[in-house]
A protein has these predicted regions:
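Short helix-initiation/N-cap motifs at beta->coil->alpha
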Residues: 35-52
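Pocket-flanking alpha-helical
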Residues: 45-49, 65-73, 211
């Protein structure tokens, strides 16, 4: 969405095209049935016995959770690939999501001590080696060199970061990233997955729901 005008950056037809793809994935058994996979939603696929047993071919994951997914089935060989894109796509489908931000507030009682910690956290070789790839690939070349040297730089995460760095991407706007919008989208996809609605009807309903929500903001 355009954060200033609240206008959609896509059409109802675009939504239907996406939902047609979702339906085809379920219809052709590319995805596990929605009735089964719903138990492992909310980034919990690593707990799915089928994933652990190596019965799935691939999955989507945040760069920061790739090592969580691979740790759930250490006997498999993993690779990192590109996001699928529709023909004629105007965007490459990648969005930057940075949920953790460290800052020293104006009400901090010991700002100097807090800044010393941040200096250690971001600039100390020891801290960079300790944190390693716990929360994704380190953002600085120095930290990556340290992690590569001590063997803590996950190669799959590094490959994913290199792929993402070549994308133009988008930043999350305040409307599409809002919990209400996310729930509307998730409910729509789930309804198509369960077969309780068709892509065209679902697209129309989703467009109306999002329009109603955003116009009220």
């Amino acid at each position: 969405f355009d954060a200033d005008s609240k206008e959609f950056n896509y059409t109802e037809e675009d939504i239907q095209n996406c939902l047609d793809l979702v339906k085809s994935l379920y219809d052709n058994n590319v995805c596990a049935p929605a009735s089964y996979s719903s138990a492992y939603s909310n980034d919990d696929l690593q707990s799915d016995p089928n994933w652990i047993a190596g019965k799935y071919v691939c999955t989507f994951a945040y760069i920061s959770t790739i090592n969580v997914m691979t740790a759930a089935n250490e006997g498999a060989t993993y690779g990192t690939g590109y996001l699928p894109l529709l023909d004629g796509a105007k965007d490459n489908g990648w969005a930057c999501n940075c949920p953790q931000v460290l800052a020293v507030t104006s009400t901090c009682k010991a700002p100097e001590a807090a800044m010393k910690f941040l200096d250690y956290f971001f600039n100390s070789d020891d801290a960079e080696s300790t944190l390693a790839c716990v929360r994704s690939v380190p953002p600085t070349e120095k930290a990556r060199e340290i992690c590569e040297k001590d063997g803590t730089l996950d190669p799959n995460m590094m490959t994913a970061a290199n792929i993402a760095s070549g994308y133009s991407g988008l930043t999350n706007d305040k409307y599409s990233s809002a919990p209400e919008s996310k729930q509307i989208i998730a409910d729509t996809i789930e309804a198509v997955g369960y077969g309780t609605t068709d892509p065209a009807s679902a697209a129309s309903d989703m467009y109306k729901q999002l329009s109603s929500y955003i116009s009220a903001q």
